[in-house]
């Protein structure tokens, strides 16, 4: 149980520290960024409002009940 708590904290720190990192993707001049979010609608709205891009959500389940939601935003650079 203690190891899973430590793992959870490390993943949360990683997600927060990597938020707003922008990277080039492919030759189509698209960039991507990501952040921890609170749902699919919030992800899509923030991505569209801030970057005029498309937001997709990835769920990372951790036992017993905690779920981390990560939003990845693809947009034209």
UniProtKB/Swiss-Prot annotation:
<keyword id="KW-0295">Fungicide</keyword>
<keyword id="KW-0611">Plant defense</keyword>
<keyword id="KW-1015">Disulfide bond</keyword>
<feature type="disulfide bond">
    <location>
        <begin position="31"/>
        <end position="77"/>
    </location>
</feature>
<dbReference type="GO" id="GO:0050832">
    <property type="term" value="P:defense response to fungus"/>
</dbReference>
<keyword id="KW-0929">Antimicrobial</keyword>
<feature type="disulfide bond">
    <location>
        <begin position="47"/>
        <end position="73"/>
    </location>
</feature>
<feature type="signal peptide">
    <location>
        <begin position="1"/>
        <end position="19"/>
    </location>
</feature>
<dbReference type="GO" id="GO:0031640">
    <property type="term" value="P:killing of cells of another organism"/>
</dbReference>
<feature type="disulfide bond">
    <location>
        <begin position="43"/>
        <end position="71"/>
    </location>
</feature>
<keyword id="KW-0964">Secreted</keyword>
<keyword id="KW-0732">Signal</keyword>
<dbReference type="GO" id="GO:0005576">
    <property type="term" value="C:extracellular region"/>
</dbReference>
<comment type="similarity">
    <text>Belongs to the DEFL family.</text>
</comment>
<protein>
    <recommendedName>
        <fullName>Putative defensin-like protein 187</fullName>
    </recommendedName>
</protein>
């Amino acid at each position: 149980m203690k190891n899973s708590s430590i793992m959870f904290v490390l993943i949360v720190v990683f997600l927060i520290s990597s938020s707003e990192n922008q990277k080039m993707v492919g030759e189509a001049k698209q960039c991507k960024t990501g952040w921890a979010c609170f749902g699919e609608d919030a992800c899509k709205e923030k991505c569209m409002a801030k970057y005029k891009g498309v937001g997709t959500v990835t769920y990372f389940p951790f036992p017993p009940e905690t779920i981390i939601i990560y939003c990845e935003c693809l947009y034209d650079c």
